[in-house]
């Protein structure tokens, strides 16, 4: 099962502690599964030619990423819903194990997995330095395409001078962490002329307003 493969990668990877607890590993998915996902993503036709905009903390207008949820995969000819289901189910079933690797983590009784493909604009796109939303417990980002780009940057504080390291962009590599308030500062951006596409999986408090795989589905 693909879900078991993903969990094995997560639980067999050591925690790195600088600048805060996180994991980073390659070969997240088996070669054939990743090839299938990448080909689907490279052929995505974006329906909304004009991206939405929002204002970041500095007051600068930046493009809003387009998020494609499993329920909408068929609209974009993405044939990967069964695989995402397997991974999300495994994350829920192993929630305590995944989080228990970390020194500190949040917890909620009503859990869900928010799974989606994120399409962020080409350069000069940049998502400002931020911390994870308080509703998120465990965050995983798998790099899909293009071949070269900028990964996730980590900081000790919410300013550029506090930059410590980058989870390097490499297709089929994954960056994971458990959000801690006022600590897990990070940002991401694009330095290429093509969309930056990732697979995002968030273990978090369930919300009816969001797209979730819910714990009760598997009980």
Which sequence ranges carry the predicted segments?
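Conserved short histidine dyad/triad with adjacent acidic residue
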Residues: 117-133
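Acidic carboxylate-rich catalytic motifs and surrounding loops in phosphoryl-/glycosyl-chemistry enzymes
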Residues: 112-119, 184-190
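Active-site rim elements
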Residues: 67-86, 125-129, 162-164, 185-189
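Short His-Asn-centered micro-motif
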Residues: 26-27, 131, 178-179
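Non-heme Fe(II)/2-oxoglutarate
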Residues: 2-5, 10-99
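Catalytic core of Fe(II)/2-oxoglutarate
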Residues: 125, 134-136, 144-219
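A short coil-to-beta-strand element that immediately follows conserved catalytic motifs
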Residues: 97-116
């Amino acid at each position: 099962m693909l879900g078991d493969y993903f969990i094995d990668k997560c639980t067999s990877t050591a925690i790195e502690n600088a600048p805060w607890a996180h994991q980073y590993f390659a070969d997240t998915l088996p070669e054939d599964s990743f090839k299938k996902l990448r080909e689907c993503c490279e052929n995505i036709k974006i329906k909304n030619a004009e991206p939405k905009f929002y204002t970041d903390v500095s007051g600068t207008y930046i493009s809003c990423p387009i998020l494609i949820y499993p329920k909408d995969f068929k609209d974009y000819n993405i044939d990967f819903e069964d695989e995402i289901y397997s991974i999300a189910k495994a994350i829920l079933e192993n929630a305590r194990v995944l989080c228990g690797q970390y020194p500190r983590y949040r917890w909620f009784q009503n859990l869900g997995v928010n799974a989606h493909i994120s399409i962020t604009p080409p350069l000069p796109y940049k998502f400002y330095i931020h911390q994870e939303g308080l509703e998120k417990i465990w965050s995983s980002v798998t790099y899909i395409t293009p071949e070269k780009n900028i990964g996730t940057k980590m900081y000790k504080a919410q300013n550029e001078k506090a930059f410590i390291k980058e989870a390097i962009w490499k297709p089929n590599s994954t960056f994971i962490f458990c959000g801690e308030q006022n600590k897990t500062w990070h940002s991401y951006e694009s330095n290429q002329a093509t969309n930056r596409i990732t697979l995002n999986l968030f273990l978090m408090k369930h919300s009816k307003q969001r797209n979730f795989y819910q714990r009760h589905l598997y009980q």
